[in-house]
C-alpha cells in the first residue's frame, strides 16, 4: 500500500509525496530546480522522493521530508508511494505513470526530434498530466503551478482519475492476445 511504500524510502506515510525523476542518467534542469525548490515544497507540506540519476553531482540526502538518491531499484514502490510526479517524458515512464493513475508534470527532453512531446500528448489532452518545456521548469513554475496543484486534493484526484483513464493497465494481456491471434 501507499503508506508502506513511503516508509520503504524513509518518508512519512501520511504526507503528500512528489516523485521526481529524470531517468537513469538524470536531468540537470529537473534536478537543479527541485534542489532550489526544497523549502517551498516543504513549507507547503509536500515531501519529495528525488531520484536524481547517475550523472548528477548532487549528494544523496535522507531528511524528514526530502529523500534524494542516485538510483532506485524499486520504481514500483516509488510510483506507489507518490501522489504526483515530475519527470522526463519517455514512453515507458508515461505509460507506467498513466497505467496506475499517477498524475505528472512532464518535462520533455529538449534535444531530439520531439518524440517526448508526442509521448505525453494523449495524457495531457486527457487532463492526466501537464507538459512544461525544459527552459520553463523553474523555481517559479514549482511555486506558482505545482505547489498549488499538488496541494489541492480535489484537483489531484481528478487528474489521477484522468491519467488512469488514458493509461493502459492490461498491455501485457493485449499483446498476448495479439500474438495468439497471429499464430
Where are these regions (language model features)?
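Conserved donor-binding/catalytic loop of nucleotide-activated donor transferases
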Residues: 80-82, 98-107, 126
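Conserved donor-binding loops in enzymes that form glycosidic bonds
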Residues: 22-24, 165, 178
